Regions:
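Small-residue-enriched flexible segments
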Residues: 1-20, 25-34, 39-41, 47, ...
Length: 332
């Protein structure tokens, strides 16, 4: 780890105090995570520090080329100078959350974040945390106008958490609130392409989808998928065996126009975590309810790359809000 820290510090160079430092380390350094921030803070200065362990790390090499490194020791550090920004960072326990039926003010007070100084949030969550969906729903409820980016950190076998905050390793969640003269605009490249029609959920138990409909036709998710498979190529059917996901409609995502359904919705890709061959049901890694639209998705690198490029080009077309920097959060 010391060598990785020296290399990162050498690339960043000596500079004044940054406003925000984002640190991401591969799980190859899991056992050394408690030493990481103290090592970095001896050489680099920032008002706020947060980050996470990841299965893959994205960053820029010494020669200026971007790289994504997976399943190998890697470290990425980003220092941001944001003059005029109102920044606040907090570490929160997720074991006891406010009631989702309570007031937005209760959630705001629990988080310790001021909604008047919160235009954007970076939200990182430990994979061992409880109530993850409730936490995200609560933050959306309490800060409806704040763009949120982030993800769930990667699990590991070391006896501590996966999140980095100030000079320590924590569990639960860490949140960086950004306001004032700065905001983060989120775009989502799904890494997948849709297959088959858009279905409506007819029956569901918690996160287990029991029945879907396509117009007047109703059937189990497995039966719907079998009909889709009949129209796929042999190569696509092979992809389904290891790269199948479910897209769940979200109407507040910024995606490219070709990723919108006929009603203008967008689909947030979620992992399928189980199939019941007895009743044809599927379990999905998200909370779903009857009436939601869903669509099966195949993971595809080219589709993700093209979509990301289109989104980034579109983000530069508004002359009144030209982007100054970009943050890439790669996770499902």
């Amino acid at each position: 780890m010391e060598e990785a820290v020296r290399e990162v510090v050498s690339q960043l160079g000596r500079r004044g105090e940054a406003d925000l430092a984002l640190v991401f380390a591969s799980t190859a350094y899991a056992s050394d995570l408690p030493r990481l921030l103290p090592l970095l803070r001896r050489e680099l200065s920032s008002r706020h520090w947060l980050g996470a362990a990841g299965g893959g790390v994205v960053g820029t090499r010494a020669d200026g080329t971007a790289a994504e490194i997976e399943q190998a020791p890697s470290l990425s550090v980003t220092l941001l100078n944001l003059p005029g920004a109102a920044i606040n960072s907090v570490a929160l326990s997720t074991t006891s959350l406010p009631d989702l039926d309570g007031s937005a003010q209760t959630w705001q007070e629990w988080s310790g974040l001021n909604p008047q100084h919160c235009r954007s949030q970076i939200l990182l969550i430990d994979p061992t945390s409880s109530n993850i969906n409730d936490l995200i729903s609560g933050m959306d409820y309490a800060f409806p106008g704040a763009e949120k980016i982030g993800g769930i950190a990667c699990p590991h076998n070391a006896p501590h958490g996966s999140l980095l905050f100030d000079d320590r390793v924590v569990t639960g969640a860490v949140i960086c609130s950004i306001g004032g003269d700065w905001r983060l605009d989120s775009v989502v490249a799904q890494g997948c392409r849709p297959i088959g029609p858009v279905f409506a959920i007819e029956q569901v138990q918690r996160n287990v989808v029991l029945e879907l409909s396509d117009g007047e036709r109703r059937d189990t998710p497995v039966a719907c998928l079998q009909r889709i498979l009949a129209d796929l190529s042999e190569e696509e059917r092979d992809q389904v065996r290891h790269s199948l996901f479910l897209g769940i409609e979200r109407r507040n995502l910024q995606l490219t126009p070709n990723r919108l359904d006929a009603a203008g919705g967008a689909f947030l890709v979620r992992t399928l975590i189980g199939v019941d061959p007895n009743n044809g049901a599927v379990a999905v890694a998200d909370r779903v309810r009857p009436g939601m639209n869903v669509q099966f998705q195949l993971r595809e690198a080219d589709a993700s790359r093209n979509e990301a490029l289109n989104l980034l080009r579109a983000s530069t077309e508004n002359p009144g809000s030209a982007p100054v920097f970009g943050l890439l959060m790669a996770c499902l």
